[in-house]
């Protein structure tokens, strides 16, 4: 599959191009305040890896949870491009894409340090989602009952395995789950937004 993959849920902005299902090029930038300025340019650079834009079959894009503003920017750009090219869109949960890069068949958590002392967390067993994502205090991560794979741009004292969002793992996850995730260019696609209503303390029953 030929596709463009965009990950913008954190301060890391990552765009990659895939040709026939294989990675061709990747561009990574770190500056969440500049996503609105940088994203259009690096997406265009990735698209220019194809001599003819008609060869691009789909756009894979992260839909959060994460930086809601950055996710909306990327999704808006992708919707516009897909509408013009009549391409499919593959919306992908950021935490599920990150989990794809984790080689852990047991029960574990994947987390993103989202803002201030809060983080988004989701529970998995191998590649299987065990529970919806929720918000909690990052200092409570140490109270979780299983391994935690975390992305954070802050110094974390907890015993976590550090990982990073990537347009590469997002694309690979999108390709494998294409038939389940794919949307038409004119379908309704919305970011995953978690509010304080989803805030859960780690030692609450909801987080188990």
Located regions from the model:
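Short amphipathic
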Residues: 25-28
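Oxyanion-binding and handling regions
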Residues: 1-22, 36, 90-208
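Short, well-ordered amphipathic alpha-helical segments that serve as non-catalytic structural scaffolds
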Residues: 35-50, 95
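Short, well-ordered alpha-helices that flank and scaffold nucleotide-derived cofactor binding pockets
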Residues: 45, 79, 83, 100-101, ...
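Residues at secondary-structure transition points
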Residues: 30-38, 68, 72, 165
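DPxDG-like acidic metal-binding loop motif
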Residues: 58-94
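Phosphate/pyrophosphate-binding loops at sites that engage ATP/ADP/AMP, CoA/4′-phosphopantetheine
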Residues: 43-58, 144-145
């Amino acid at each position: 599959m030929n596709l463009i993959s965009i990950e913008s849920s954190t301060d890391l902005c990552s765009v990659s191009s895939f040709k026939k299902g294989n990675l061709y090029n990747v561009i990574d930038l770190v500056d969440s305040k500049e996503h609105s300025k940088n994203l259009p340019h690096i997406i265009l650079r990735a698209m220019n890896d194809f001599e003819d834009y008609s060869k691009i079959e789909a756009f894979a894009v992260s839909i959060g949870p994460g930086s809601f503003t950055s996710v909306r920017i990327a999704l808006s750009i992708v919707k516009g491009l897909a509408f013009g090219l009549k391409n499919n869109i593959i919306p992908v949960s950021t935490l599920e894409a990150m989990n794809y890069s984790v080689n852990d068949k047991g029960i574990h958590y994947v987390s993103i340090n989202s803002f201030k002392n809060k983080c988004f967390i989701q529970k998995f067993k191998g590649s299987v989602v065990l529970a919806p994502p929720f918000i909690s205090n990052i200092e409570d991560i140490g109270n979780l009952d299983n391994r935690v794979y975390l992305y954070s741009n802050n110094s974390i004292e907890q015993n976590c395995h550090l990982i990073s969002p990537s347009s590469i793992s997002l694309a690979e996850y999108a390709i494998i789950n294409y038939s389940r995730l794919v949307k038409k260019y004119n379908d309704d696609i919305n970011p995953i937004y978690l509010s304080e209503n989803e805030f859960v303390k780690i030692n609450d029953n909801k987080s188990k």
